[in-house]
């Protein structure tokens, strides 16, 4: 894994804005013979765009993960269910929607009017099948097995082809965590722990395919922290949350067995929804568990207004030797464009706290499907410009 040895490197979390024609092809469930040539071309273009905007460590924009509308918060996890056997759609679960997941959320009680308005807007947006809402009805009813070999190899080959001749430092690909997968209902395994372990066994095949292709594997695990708001915040149950999170760390490490740590980066965030986030658990309550994940780099939110102050945690929490922190220094949570000098300030704070060689500048979360494409690319440009300013200060 590349490090910031002589300058601050830049990357992002994964999702980038999809071309309009690609979104339409996914939305229309176009046949592979029509979709795949467009997908391959789009990946080639997005790799070049990342390089043009100054991103050092690039990916395929997650274009192989189907987005059926321009604004889509769920493609990063919903992509995997067509790659897993063992699920069936139950209409009674689908009708419950996301609300069935957030039964323990103090925030959703305190801001009930806001969330009711958000739900109404989401229902309107989902007309025509443009949302992932029906996926909430998927239920595990049989042994979970990975069946996505062809899909992940397609994505791998598209990225390899796109990188040919490109002036790129390094490339990564994303895959979802067991903790996120186990949120959907289970009607087969005896308990949630057995269910999670089975998911870890299944998804490890995708992890290994990415690493075997010589890409950096990024595991996306928002659930490791945002589950606190959904399931534990009503009773302020930090102890119960930590017990749950500790098991999830064991599960992801099980999935990572045999994969070198220096080929893995691990991403957490507090969810992509544009809400108050008052119920978010603090990084201080989970950082020790985070650092037990067998990854070399940890990708965290640090640019949004609810979590920016948490850089100070690293004054008292030692980043283990050889590890890398990829803090988000531009945010998906706002359309306001970060000034490059602010980006530089954020980078420098981390660099002076944990060492400049241990910092890579990143984004809070994926930008595709969260903000308008023009805003997304402008944020990546600000990220690159800010990293250059930080480099001048740190290496002067």
Per-range role (PLM):
Residues 1-396:
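Domain-level signal for soluble alpha/beta catalytic cores
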């Amino acid at each position: 894994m590349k490090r910031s040895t002589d300058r601050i490197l830049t990357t992002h979390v994964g999702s980038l804005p999809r071309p309009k024609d690609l979104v339409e092809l996914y939305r229309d469930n176009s046949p592979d013979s029509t979709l795949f040539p467009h997908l391959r071309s789009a990946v080639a273009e997005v790799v070049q765009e990342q390089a043009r905007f100054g991103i050092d460590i690039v990916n395929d924009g997650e274009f192989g993960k189907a987005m059926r509308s321009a604004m889509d918060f769920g493609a990063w996890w919903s992509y995997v269910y067509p790659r897993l056997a063992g699920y069936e759609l139950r209409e009674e679960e689908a009708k419950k929607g996301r609300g069935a997941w957030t039964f323990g959320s103090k925030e959703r009680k305190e801001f009930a009017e806001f969330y009711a308005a958000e739900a109404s807007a989401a229902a309107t947006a989902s007309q025509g099948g443009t949302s992932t809402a029906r996926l909430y009805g998927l239920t595990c009813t049989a042994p979970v097995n990975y069946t996505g070999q062809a899909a992940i190899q397609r994505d791998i080959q598209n990225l390899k082809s796109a990188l040919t001749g490109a002036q790129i430092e390094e490339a990564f690909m994303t895959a979802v965590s067991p903790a996120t997968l186990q949120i959907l209902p289970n009607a087969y395994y005896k308990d949630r722990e057995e269910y999670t372990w089975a998911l870890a066994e299944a998804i490890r095949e995708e992890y290994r395919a990415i690493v075997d292709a010589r890409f950096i594997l990024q595991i996306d695990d928002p659930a490791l922290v945002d589950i606190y708001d959904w399931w534990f915040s009503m009773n302020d149950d930090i102890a119960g949350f930590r017990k749950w999170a500790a098991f999830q760390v064991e599960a992801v490490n099980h999935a990572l067995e045999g994969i070198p740590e220096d080929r893995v980066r691990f991403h957490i965030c507090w969810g992509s929804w544009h809400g108050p986030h008052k119920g978010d658990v603090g990084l201080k309550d989970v950082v020790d568990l985070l650092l037990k994940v067998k990854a070399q780099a940890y990708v965290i939110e640090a640019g949004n207004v609810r979590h920016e102050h948490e850089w100070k945690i690293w004054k008292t929490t030692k980043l283990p030797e050889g590890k890398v922190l990829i803090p988000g220094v531009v945010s998906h949570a706002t359309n306001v464009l970060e000034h490059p000098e602010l980006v530089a300030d954020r980078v420098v704070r981390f660099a002076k706290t944990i060492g400049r060689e241990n910092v890579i500048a990143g984004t809070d979360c994926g930008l595709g499907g969260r903000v308008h494409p023009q805003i997304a690319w402008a944020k990546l440009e600000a990220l690159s410009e800010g990293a250059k300013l930080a480099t001048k200060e740190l290496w002067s």
